[in-house]
């Protein structure tokens, strides 16, 4: 299945989690390699949407909150392309899709 175009990617997920330098589970350094920073955070949103629109999402289990979907693919950044896994959730309460996270893909 494809993640719908109206799926939600919260601003805070990008600016306060993925692109913010953190002591634990830091992803900002990985994303910086591709040219994503807090200065161009919306470019990251667009790249996530582009990947999600071009690759089938695979059911990755679920819990009481919803069903998780995984997308493995190439995230195209301003200076480099990264192999990533995107995680989305279709929430049980409203059936809407929400972006959860991305992580480096082990090849």
Enumerate the language-model features and the residues they cover.
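Compact soluble domain cores
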Residues: 1-70
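Short, compact, well-ordered microdomains
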Residues: 63-107
